[in-house]
Amino acid sequence: MSEQQRQGAERDLYRDTWVRYLGYANEVGEAFRSLVPAAVVWLSYGVSSSYVLADAIDKGKKAGEVPSPEAGRNTRMALAVVDTFVWQSLASVAIPGFTINRLCAASLYVLGTMTHWPPTVRKWTTTTLGLLAIPVIIHPIDRSVDFLLDSSLRKLYPSVEKPSTP
């Protein structure tokens, strides 16, 4: 097998392709909250949540494909699904969504009280700030969620069966 084929076989659809960006849909929705109907924001959460669920199921299936004694297979699959689902729910949906929501709400408030800009300019400025913040918050949130899970949920896993960090 060539190096390129081997890399292609190891490529994770949910982590190494454009599909990963579906996990950021809710952050984009939150950034645009002041400009779009609430239903659009909720739809963005639906997209992100679907991504999280699909990734968790995929990791469970992959854990089940690892050759090992059948007795540990179900446990390994369950741990992979739970770990991925919790990690992705926190790192891709809940924490970034809350962060962008609060950043945009605060910036809209500050712009409203400290400037005389028209509402449309304030809203677009807020949206721009929210969008620009997304790449800045991703890695600190990911590392924080790693630390949180390593310090809590992952301590409950059997030592041999710890899933790899998403």
Swiss-Prot record:
Modification sites for N6-succinyllysine: K123
Signal peptide: none
Pfam families assigned to the protein according to its UniProt record, in alphabetical order: MTP18 (PF10558)
GO BP, one annotated term: mitochondrial fission
Membrane protein topology class: Multi-pass membrane protein
Keyword Ligase listed: no
GO cellular component, one term: mitochondrion
Keywords attached to this entry: Apoptosis, Membrane, Mitochondrion, Mitochondrion inner membrane, Transmembrane, Transmembrane helix
Places the protein is found: Mitochondrion inner membrane
Presence of keyword Mitochondrion: yes
Ranges annotated as spanning the membrane: 34-54, 78-98, 129-149
UniProt function note: Involved in the mitochondrial division probably by regulating membrane fission. Loss-of-function leads to apoptosis.
Record family assignment: Belongs to the MTFP1 family.
Entry protein name: Mitochondrial fission process protein 1
Gene that encodes the chain: Mtfp1
